[in-house]
Amino acid sequence: MKKFNIMAVLLLFSISVLAIVPPDNVQATFKKMYPKTNDIAWSQDDGYYCANFVMNGFTKNVWFNAQGQWEMTQTDLVSLDRLTPVVYNAFTFSSYASWVAEDVTMVEFPKWQAIIVIEVGQDNVDIKYQLFYTPKGILLNPLTVSEKSPQKAKNQTEG
């Protein structure tokens, strides 16, 4: 029993040591933006602090720089039916409408318009695209994000 208690204490200690605690300025900016949010999981990626939480049924990732300035918010929309009618109609009337929507995310920025990103693929095909839509339903340049995209394959054979 003592061995189990010691193991549990060590596990809890290791988790608390690995937990990210952002600087006060980052936490202050976050609290101004989301004053009623609880259960926040903080992480750090390439110098940015990211608050991960659920709000109104949506998973959100809010990114801040080390100076405490908001950089972007990613909201996982889960499926196409959570899109605005304008973006939904733009997608359903596009040449990608028959493709499978694998991920739907809205990305908001402090100084730019929001972008809706729909990742699509096809059954039994390795090519995937990220489709970037404006809130007005305008499709921007699609981006190939496949593991075996032609550009990646070309780069691998040249290297």
Named regions from a protein language model:
Residues 1-6:
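Positively charged n-region of N-terminal signal peptides that target proteins for export
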Residues 20-159:
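Interaction-mediating elements
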